[in-house]
């Protein structure tokens, strides 16, 4: 029998954006309904994206560390298959799911496990697996339904050897050779994972360099590291046809080349999950990639309907999505948002080694004609890196020659995504608080990776004249 519910707010999706919105609203005393398509909360971030890929990377990193560290003096090489490390990822996913389920239960958020669809501007239907439906009405609605891999119709994703970045987690055989089509963040991260398992990797890049949004020095470092570890990178290539065979996949490139491997991971773009929401019933329209336009308070064209997370596009980061949800909750509760996303959002790319950056790149500062200087520290010169056997990597600080204000920080190496936040904290200081001299005038624990900031600061300041 169909039930009819009334809430203060409806949140569609339980990923980082939906969680941020729901938790922010209940803390303000609102009665919140959360509609999640799947039986478990967490969204794509927890089940197919950020969490599993980082868990896989961690497992592979530890295997590489064991095999390369002379401390262990191994007579044999430790090895694992992709299905082996998937078990570690599954354990982490289960822990994350239980924890996040507890958030909703403790805060008395009503969860509905079904597909959401707009009936009108204040009413959403929930369709369940058994064919039944309920309807929910609310004054405010937050769309946080996330995104999914972009699957072009010309590629047969039903073929058992052709995967996207979601279905790759169902890989149950042991490939010796993998083609990864798309050299964005996801493609590069999985290239690191598979190569770390001693799987041959062909990385097909549709552009002229890897991760072109990065500082070129960081991009070049990753390219060299891939090359040094045996990843074959094919730049400026596009597929003509992807052919599934009985024992693998053949990719026919527009340049005339052909590449054959045991399987293919297609990782070239994502699309918003808005096609089944019934947006036409409320007069909203998504773009060609399923994304919604919003204002600074994450309101859509209808002021009581908000959208956050991957479904609004850039920056498409789990960290930013949570903050967007929290800001939208503030706007709903008080009519305006006191918070806002910081201007310089840190980026973490979990390749092996990691890459992380915040602020401007050298290329951007040069184009802006900003008089900047560079301070560098190489990890191989740090005692902590030598102790840990993590000598690959560097930290680069970009700062204004005259004011000494930090303009950008770029890090390549183990724990880069952690190290970056030290510099970010100083960059966020107002006025004279943002200065490279902080790293010279403060005392760091020794030995630490954080010491790279002092080394880089001294290196940069010594360039001034």
UniProtKB/Swiss-Prot annotation:
Signal sequence annotation: none
GO cellular component, one term: cytosol
Location within or outside the cell: Cytoplasm
Cofactor binding comment, as recorded: Binds 1 FAD per subunit.
Cofactor(s) the record lists: FAD
InterPro entries: Class-I_Pyr_Nuc-Dis_Oxidored, FAD/NAD-bd_sf, FAD/NAD-binding_dom, FAD/NAD-linked_Rdtase_dimer_sf, Pyr_nuc-diS_OxRdtase, Pyr_nucl-diS_OxRdtase_dimer, STH_gammaproteobact
Main location: cytoplasm
Keyword Flavoprotein among record annotations: yes
Primary enzyme class: oxidoreductase
Residue sites binding FAD per the record: 36-45
GO terms, biological process: 2-oxoglutarate metabolic process; NADP metabolic process
Xref: Pfam families: Pyr_redox_2, Pyr_redox_dim
Job description of the protein: Conversion of NADPH, generated by peripheral catabolic pathways, to NADH, which can enter the respiratory chain for energy generation.
Protein name as annotated: Soluble pyridine nucleotide transhydrogenase
Species of provenance: Serratia proteamaculans (strain 568)
Gene assigned in the entry: sthA
